[in-house]
């Protein structure tokens, strides 16, 4: 632990969470100018303050990451909240989404709502059609894309993601994420350690709170049976 205490275990369940892949000019410290605000706290407040200080007629630009990442609908829920605020407070403003993929979670529902409520305020650009980010300057808020430069008044840059530091420090990672046995959630790399939540590779399960909750229950159930020499159960099918 951080205080130096060592806790012995027979089985351990860990949820390392996520960390960010800094590249394309978005380096550690860039959050002071272009917050990702994808971990709640100071950056959330900063992004809110930047929006409040933005002029009417300004441009809010979000760079949405490629899959996989925490909470797939999250960026688009945020865009909806920003659009609501701008419509009622800075109605001449514009939102541009530079998406590093060609489709996103619940896309039809989001775009139907945006068209109904915000008309031309929101401009979503897929990676194939003008959204691909080549580089970014967080201080000047200039984003270079394969279709030219985009200049933001407020830049919300959400980097691509990887498993949290604990996972890397513990040898649980292959590539960016933690491979697991999907029947038990035991790590494929470290015996008797079970990885749940956003850090694990759990097939088609999204990196969501519901998924993490369900994974924890399955891991606990299987561990309880292993410890008393009972056979494993087949986990139920889950829907999110």
Regions of interest found by a model, annotated:
Residues 65, 100-102, 198:
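Cofactor-binding loop segments of dinucleotide-utilizing enzymes, especially the Rossmann-like FAD-
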Residues 66-90, 178, 187-195, 204, ...:
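Active-site substrate-recognition segment that forms the wall
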Residues 1-70, 74-77, 84-88, 156:
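FAD-binding core/adjacent interface of flavoenzyme oxidoreductases
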Residues 23-25, 71-73, 107, 166-168, ...:
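Short glycine-/acidic-enriched loop or helix-start segments at secondary-structure transitions
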Residues 199-239:
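A conserved FAD-binding loop/helix module that cradles the flavin
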Residues 29-56, 150-214:
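FAD-site-proximal beta/loop scaffold in flavoenzymes
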Residues 1, 7, 84-176, 231-233:
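A Rossmann-like FAD-binding core segment of flavoenzymes
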Residues 59, 92-96, 192:
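Residues at the starts of beta-strands that form the adenosine-phosphate
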């Amino acid at each position: 632990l951080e205080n130096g205490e060592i806790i012995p275990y027979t089985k351990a369940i860990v949820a390392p969470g996520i960390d960010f892949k800094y590249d394309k000019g978005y380096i550690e410290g860039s959050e002071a100018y272009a917050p990702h605000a994808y971990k709640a706290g100071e950056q959330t407040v900063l992004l809110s303050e930047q929006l409040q200080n933005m002029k009417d007629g300004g441009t809010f630009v979000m760079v949405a990451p490629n899959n996989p990442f925490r909470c797939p609908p999250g960026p688009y829920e945020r865009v909806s909240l920003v659009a609501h605020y701008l419509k009622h407070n800075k109605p001449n403003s514009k939102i541009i989404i530079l998406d590093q993929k060609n489709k996103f979670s619940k896309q039809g529902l989001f775009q139907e709502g945006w068209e109904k409520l915000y008309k031309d305020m929101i401009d979503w650009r897929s990676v194939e059609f003008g959204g691909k980010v080549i580089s970014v300057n967080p201080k000047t808020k200039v984003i270079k894309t394969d279709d030219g430069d985009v200049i933001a008044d407020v830049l919300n840059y959400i980097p691509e993601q990887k498993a949290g530091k604990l996972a890397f420090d513990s040898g649980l990672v292959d590539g960016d994420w933690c491979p697991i046995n999907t029947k038990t959630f035991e790590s494929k790399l470290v015996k008797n350690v079970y990885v749940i939540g956003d850090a694990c590779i759990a097939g088609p399960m999204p990196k969501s709170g519901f998924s993490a909750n369900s994974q924890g229950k399955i891991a606990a159930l299987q561990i309880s049976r292993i410890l008393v020499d009972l056979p494993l159960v087949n986990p139920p099918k889950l829907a999110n």
